[in-house]
Structure formats: C-alpha cells, structure tokens
Amino acid sequence: MNFENLLIEVGTEELPPKSLRKLAESFLSNFTDELKKAELSFESAVWHAAPRRLAICVNQLALAQADKVVEKRGPAIAQAFDTDGNPTKAAMGWARGNGITVEQAGRLKTDKGEWLLHQAKVVGVETKSLIAAMAQRSLDKLPIPKPMRWGNNTTQFIRPVHTVTMLLGSEVVEGELLGQKSARIIRGHRFMGKASFELVHADNYLSALKEQGKVEANYEVRKALIKAGAEAAAAKIGGVADLEDDLLEEVTSLVEWPVVLTANFEEKFLDVPAEALVYTMKGDQKYFPVFDKAGQLMPNFIFVTNIESKDPQQIIAGNERVVRPRLADAEFFFETDKKDSLESRLTSLETVIFQKQLGTIKDRVARISDMAGFIANSIDANADEAARAGLLSKSDLMTNMVMEFTDLQGTMGMHYARLNGETEAVALALQEQYKPKFSGDTVPTAPVSVCVALAEKLDTLVGIFGIGQAPKGAADPFALRRAAIGILRICVENNLPLNLIDLIAKAQELHGSNLTNDKAAEQVLEFFMGRFRAWYQDQGVSVDVILAVLARRPTSPADFDSRIKAVSHFRSLEQASALAAANKRVSNILAKVEGELPAAIDAGLLVENAEKVLAEKLNELQPQLAPLFAAANYQEALALLADLRESVDTFFEDVMVMADDEALKNNRLALLSSLREQFLHAADISLLQ
C-alpha cells in the first residue's frame, strides 16, 4: 500500500483569539475520527493555527482503503433447499441480491447449524475522493456558537473564508469546502512577505509559509518564541514577566509573526495599586507586566507586535501613548475613591438591589456581618474583626475603580481598607471573601478571611434556595454550585469544627421572613451532599467509597473528609473485600428482622465457639474504638475492625444465625447488629465493591 502526507488549510479573516486553539484541536479530532470511520490508516496527525488560518497535517496517510472481504450470511440450509434439494425462493432471492447464483454460494458451518455464505470482495476507495467530504463534515462539527455569512454565499462559518488548500503530497485534492474550491494558493502575512504563493507539496507547508509568507503557522513554536522573547526582555531590565498562560495563549492567537518589544510608563502610576495597573495592561492591552525580584511592579511592560519594523522605537512609542490614558484613568479613579471611606459608602448600598426578595446590598452585608461573627465564635476567630469585615465586604462595589474594573472587587476593598486604617485581618478578608473563585484556586486560611468567605457564600446559597430558585439542569445564574464547593473546601482544608446544619439554620434565621420555601434547609443540605460527591469524584475517589460515607450523611465537612480518607485506606487493605461482603450479608439479615432488634448480647446464650470468639473480640475492641470514633480517627478505628475478618468468616461458616431456638437467634442477631454498628460509626462498608 502507498502512503502520502496530507495538508488541509482553511484561510480566513482573523479568527477569535480565545477560540483559536479549541477550533484547531476540534478540527483535527473530527478529521481523524473521519479517517478511522473510513478505515484509512495514517501514522500521525497534527494541527496548526494562526490568526487567519486553520490547518491539519496527516502523516503517512494511506492512498486508498484496504481491500476487504465481507461475509454475507444467507438462509439456513434447511430453509435454502426443499426436500428434493432444489433452491427455495428465499435462497434464490438472497443469491440474486448478492449478484450470484445459489450454486456459487459457499457454506458456513458452526456448532449451531449451517448457512449459505457469500464472501464478497470490496475494493478500497481512493483516499483523494473521500477527503473533501470528510473535511467538510469535520468543519461542520466545529464548536461555533454564532456562525456568520459573507458576500452572496449561503455558506456559514466563524469568519469569512478566502482560500482552501488540500494537498495529498504534491497533488491538489479536488473538492470544495465552505464555498471555496481547493487550490495551491496560500496567503501570507498581511504586511510582510508574499501576499500569496503556490504551495508545491504538503510537506513544505510550514517552511514555505515561514520563508515566503512571513507566517509562523506552528502554534506551539509561536507560543514558545513569545515566551522566550518575553522572558529575555524582562531579564534584560532586571525583572520577571508575568506570563499567565491564558494571556500567553491569547497573544499567540493574535499574531502570525511575533516580535517582542519592551516599553515603559511613568513611575508616578506605581502609586496606584498594582492590581489595577496589571488589570489594565493585561485585560485591555494584552501586555505582559514586569515585576522586580521582590515582586514589585516595575514601570515597564512587554508587548508583542505582528510586524518587523525598521524603526521599532516608533511602535514602542505608539503603545506607550495608548496605555497612558488607561493608566491615568486608573490613577484618577483611585485618587477620587480615597476621598471617601468604605464605611461612608454603606448608605449608598441601600440603592443597589441584591435580589428582589432578599433585599438590598446593605441588607446583605448586615447578614454577612452577623454570620461572620457567628462563625468566628465557633472557630475561635476574632468575632469583632469578622463582623467588621462582613459589614464592609461590599462597600468597594460603590467605588469608581470597581465600577470601571469589576474584576477588582474585593481587591480594591483591601487597599481602601488599609488606607482607612482598618486592621490587616479585616483588609485581607475583603480581598479573600470571594475565594476560591475557580477550580484549583486556593482557599482563605486567615481566620477572619475564612469567616467572611463562608458567610458570603452561605448568605447567597441559603437565600436563593429559600426563595425557590435552586439551580436547574446546567443553569446556575447565582453560581450556587461553586459557592457550595467553596464552603466545603474552606471547611475541609482548614479542618474547621463546623456543622452544615448549624450554618444553614443561622443563615435562615438571618434572612428571616424573606424566605418563602419551607423546605430550604433540607434542600440546601441535600445540595451539599451532591456537591460532596461531585468534588470527591473529581479528585479520583472511588464512587463506592463516596456512597459508603454518604450513607451515614455526615454534616460536618471536615468529618466527612476524615471518613472518605479512612474508607479509601480501608478499601486498600487485604481484609476489606471479605469484610465488605460480610457487612452486606449482615445488612441483608438484619433488614429481614421484623420488629426491634435485641438490645444487648447475652454471654450465657453464646453456644458455638465461633460466636464466643467474635463476641469476645468485639468486647475487647469496643473500649479502644470508642475514643477513636469520638476523635474522628476513623482510619485507625477501621484498621482495628479489619482484624475481625477471620472471626467474622469463621462465624458465618460455623454458626446458623436464624436458629430454631428464638433466644439463640435473637442473641446472634444482637451480635451481628453490634458488629455492624461499629462499622457504621465510620461508613456503610457493605456498599464497597
């Protein structure tokens, strides 16, 4: 079989930078799926992407499908011939449908019988005749939320398409994609190199674009060039560039020929909180800020231009002119905001509605303040500072800086609190109240910050459930799932002695008559249980371990976590499988008992040696287990219980639980109930697989 390399490039107008990687990866994934469905072999495949192009390269693609033999089974021999041995209508119809006579058919013999069989040879189709249709289907499946039309075309795509190039080796693959016929034409850089050129061979794609078109189409190479260039530029001025990957990806998707340059801004702007300056540089201008070795922002920034200039200083000066008004705005907002304290802004919070049924933002901060103080008393934090931080938690929403740069809420509150003379604990809590903001974000650990972060999330969660607006399906407009996970993570990662039932009840109390859903507490608790499951599954914890703990419905997050870790460890023990099976057996036996189970074990009714041994071992373990369970040391407790495996196995081998003698039976049920009760202190081990 012969092989060739394939190139497919779609040349477009500028593609959305934040979608470029996803589009390219999806194009490649869709196309390789098509190749596999068509049974076309290939060695490897890669994607390339730049602002005005999506491309895939397939290495060593088979030039045709392999020939194959398809077996088509006909009627059973008993139905294929009559008693005289002549073909039946069924046999002749089947043969005719396959283009043969009955006499030409073979036979298929199995242990289940014998059938007519036709082995048809299917000649493989040439690859070049399949490519265009496969490519079109691949493009049709791209994740494009809002496709557009252009010109007089009825074709839709994410951006107007100007060229399509499909080359199988040096041969142009005939066909049409997105309204454009395939040709050799490749467009180069808008302002450098050749505007367009003919590509001779698929293998030359990257090199020809680079040499003739002044385009680096290899996305990862382009990204690496930008990263290395920015690092070198920052080091040259004694700093370190902030190369956050999301911004690095976006900049990579904005340029075809990256040139890294360094610019400056006036040092006076450094009096403005660094976060505001960084937000402006990164968010608005796509610049990389530079920090010194002490972590302080420097009056410099690094940017990437899409052109090589004979006078780069002119480009630098232009970017400095562009960023200056933005920094000046931030400076003005900051200086203006400083004239009023956070406390003085509380009155203005009355004008902002949090939620129609839940009141204003001022009502909300009053609840957060009370809730933070309540939590502080429960975890030995400073209740006055927690209440103060809760009261001021939303005041920065009324500042010019946050109104202009909404992502700085909390952060600007921290800076203004420091300027107002608030304690550092209060100031830090204002910044950390929203943490964790996303999966993988850190949780607050400072006691006052913990109190406010929990209070802020609980107020939202209980309030929204309390007015009957729980999340439905994928819709979650108040981000309640994130809030619930945040609460659980803060409690677990700080090992806080808090109970969800108490927290929910206090939040309900603070909302008062605002809440109309009388089942809110129950629903919120159930919501937390669901979040527990989702969170631990994301961490790779086995579902059966999670279900074993959920069966006990622990309402303290830290306690829940201790049980998860203990059961995960227990599950890895040699004895776990047998004890899980035994627990399941015990559970089934006890479930069939009518009425109440016997309360205590009567030693005088222990007849068989196996039941005496099990009862004795249980009796010996209980004084050791009680303090372990009381201290939530479930791992050590389950390790002790694991030692019962042999005694439990022997009990079930030698003892008839449901004895005819009622007294013996009840005593044995009491023994099994006592055994199961010890395991249930940690989890329902019977659910382990």
UniProtKB/Swiss-Prot annotation:
**Pfam families per the UniProt record, alphabetical:** DALR_1, tRNA_synt_2f
Among the GO molecular function terms of this UniProt record, one is: glycine-tRNA ligase activity
Which compartments is it annotated to reside in? Answer: Cytoplasm
Which coarse location class applies to the principal site listed for this UniProt protein?
A: cytoplasm
Listed EC numbers: 6.1.1.14
Q: Give the record's keywords alphabetically.
A: Aminoacyl-tRNA synthetase, ATP-binding, Cytoplasm, Ligase, Nucleotide-binding, Protein biosynthesis
Q: Which residues form the signal peptide?
A: none
What family name appears in the similarity comment? Belongs to the class-II aminoacyl-tRNA synthetase family.
Could you give the subunit structure recorded for this chain?
A: Tetramer of two alpha and two beta subunits.
Q: What is the name of the protein in this document?
A: Glycine--tRNA ligase beta subunit
Which organism is this entry from?
Shewanella sediminis (strain HAW-EB3)
